Amino acid sequence: RKSRNDVAVIGNEVYIGAGAKIIGPVKIGDKVTVGANSVVTHDIVSNSVVAGIPAKYLEVNE
């Protein structure tokens, strides 16, 4: 049986590009852009842009 700890938590105003995959119980902050075909395997801080396999930070806005 799955618990709520086994799912991804996605913040507000998040854009997830086509084909992107979110793997595991990660937390994605608010106002994040995930590039197309990216694979997210770790938590992403708010106000950032990530892309790649695995997803890496391209930009972090304060």
Description of each model-found segment:
Residues 1-2, 26, 61:
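Conserved catalytic-core motifs of eukaryotic protein kinase domains, centered on the activation segment
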Residues 6, 11-12, 17-24, 29-30, ...:
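Left-handed beta-helix
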Residues 47, 60-61:
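Surface-exposed loop/turn and secondary-structure junction residues enriched for glycine/proline
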